[in-house]
Amino acid sequence: MTVKLAPSILDADFGYLADQVEAAAAGGADWIHVDVMDGQFVPNLTLGPMVVRAIRRATTLPLDVHLMLVRPRDWIAPFRDAGADLLTFHLEADLHPHRTLQAIKEAGVGAGLALNPGTPILQAVPLVELLDLLLVMSVNPGLGGQQFIPAALTRLERARAMLQAENRADCELEVDGGVKLDNIADVVHAGATMVVAGSAVYGEGAVEVNLRNLRGAAA
């Protein structure tokens, strides 16, 4: 199985955003990961549907929009209309996640659920039938460039076992936070099928080369 790579534009140069997205596509990215933060659920404030619409114009790659905000259900239609292909929200941010997942599916886009590092994996079990993607955070959400939390490897293994036990091995298992050349093989071995990488792609060096190196290290 070939792991999917989803560069996070949170670490891109926003002055040249279209170029940065195009460079990711040229380097073999499978998805573009877009971090949306509201300054309430997480301390940082990033972007909204207008920027997602601009990214949509810049690429044909599918857009993985990660909603780190309160009241995620209110934002399904705006981000769907802006061009999102998959919407992921945090279990911790929603009192009625089942309704939100149903609303995302009804909107015609993929549905993802994110779990913070301190949230037990088993809390996703009642919702797994509605998921296209389960996101295991390997940092605390809200800021780019954080260090990978090693316990995320065990959590990925538990998540993979849970998906298999629930007959949902087809569900993407994504990891986000601190993934670099020296640990990408570990997260793939632990069960991740989709990897978000920010500073490892948009930090030092050429974006295309960085992505190819990550792909090689993941094999």
Q: What are these regions, as identified by a protein language model?
A:
Residues 192-197, 202-203:
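Acidic, Mg2+-coordinating phosphoryl-transfer loop and its flanking beta/alpha structural elements
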Residues 1-88, 93-96, 103, 110-111, ...:
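Conserved N-terminal beta1-alpha1 strand-loop-helix module at the mouth
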Residues 4, 114, 135-138, 174, ...:
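Conserved beta-strand segments that form the floor/walls of ligand-binding pockets within enzyme
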Residues 139, 145-146, 168-170:
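Strongly charged, low-complexity linkers/loops
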Residues 18-19, 163-174, 187:
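Non-catalytic terminal and connector segments of soluble metabolic enzymes
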Residues 118-120, 180:
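Short acidic loop-to-helix transition motifs that present clustered carboxylates
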